[in-house]
Amino acid sequence: MALVPPLGREFPPEPVNCPLAAPRELDVVGGTICPAPEEETSRPEQVQASLGLPEHCMGELKSTESATSPSRLPLASSHEHQDGGKPCEHSDSGLEVLEAEQDSLHLCLLRLNFRLQDLERGLGSWTLAHNRIVQMQALQAELRGAAERVDALLAFGEGLAERSEPRAWASLEQVLRALGTHRDTIFQRLWQLQAQLISYSLVLEKANLLDQDLEVEGDSDGPAAGGVWGPWAPSTFPTPAELEWDPAGDVGGLGPSGQKISRIPGAPCELCGYRGPQSSGQGLEDLLSLGLGHRKHLAAHHRRRLRKPQDRKRQVSPSLPDAMLEVDRGVPAPASKRPLTLFFLLLFLLLVGATLLLPLSGVSCCSHARLARTPYLVLSYVNGLPPI
């Protein structure tokens, strides 16, 4: 059985559109895989006939297979009874069917790999990208069918391994694991190509729509049949006679016929006596607007009441930025602040004079204190003066 060639190899650009191999009927309970009656064992010569690949591509494929393919699974030599040495016919037939299914799946995945490389080669216009998305969806459906066959083959191989020798199962497990890895790699590449094609088709679709808009604008730039401004058509806008008078845009209190409209003053406020805006009082809208204005005025009073404690706190201890904001440059300083500045100036001069006069008056005091504190001895004789 041939392992998968490296995914990074380049193959000729001929498209491969051959149908998938016929799926096999799995009989896991009986321990065998029954091939379809019309199906035969796939071989490298059948690859060239089914895929339609050129001879140099098949040469590369054969060289790759000879370099990377493991040896065939041992049939009669490794599956013998330990007591009598007779080969187990049931196990041998299961391994033969498993090997044939493995070859068929390898060819199927190889064909899907070629088709995926065909789709990955290059992207052209938006139409080509859209067609490739359709081809990719068909390829994805075929790959799902192949993945189901691989899963069934793995399940059958696990059941067969329970009745075979450990050495034979080791080689079988290695081959089946390679098939699963190849399947996962193709799925991953297919998902990457799907995301690339979708993003590319969206970009090309936007560019195509932009080109169509530019073509339409370019066609409409030239003068029409009726001249530069086009053919004349009756306007759908209303004439001045059909326009209605809007009281919101009235200036001077005049109605639609130029007559003076009598205005009704609004209700006075219970707190400050303010009267709201005047209205004609002829419709329901005027009454509603008066009531709404009165409610807004009362809400403003309520907000002022809530703000008064905060304003008092700010007036008691104003911060430096607030005091700076309150000063107006164009207005001179009030006269009440001048005595305060004079008082601070006199206080400063008084302190300076006191500091100058204190050292002069403190010289004598310090001298008396020093004399009083100077220690001296007083000698007193009890029996008189000593003899000379």
Curated annotation (Swiss-Prot):
Recorded phenotype for the gene knockout or disruption: Mice are born at the expected Mendelian rate and look overtly normal. In the cochlea, outer hair cells form, but appear to degenerate as hearing matures. Inner hair cells remain intact. Hearing loss is already detected at P15 and progresses at all frequencies by P60.
Region (Disordered): 60-92
SMART domains: KASH
Residue spans, topological domain Cytoplasmic: 1-339
Residue spans, topological domain Perinuclear space: 361-388
PROSITE patterns: KASH
InterPro entries registered for this protein in UniProt: KASH, SYNE4
Transmembrane regions: 340-360
Maturation and modification: The disulfid bond with SUN1 or SUN2 is required for stability of the respective LINC complex under tensile forces.
Compositional bias ranges of the Basic and acidic residues kind: 78-92
KASH domain ranges (all copies): 331-388
Function in brief: As a component of the LINC (LInker of Nucleoskeleton and Cytoskeleton) complex, involved in the connection between the nuclear lamina and the cytoskeleton. The nucleocytoplasmic interactions established by the LINC complex play an important role in the transmission of mechanical forces across the nuclear envelope and in nuclear movement and positioning. Behaves as a kinesin cargo, providing a functional binding site for kinesin-1 at the nuclear envelope.
The record's note on its domains: The KASH domain, which contains a transmembrane domain, mediates the nuclear envelope targeting and is involved in the binding to SUN1 and SUN2 through recognition of their SUN domains.
The name this protein goes by in its record: Nesprin-4
Organism listed in the record: Mus musculus (Mouse)
Gene name, Swiss-Prot/TrEMBL: Syne4
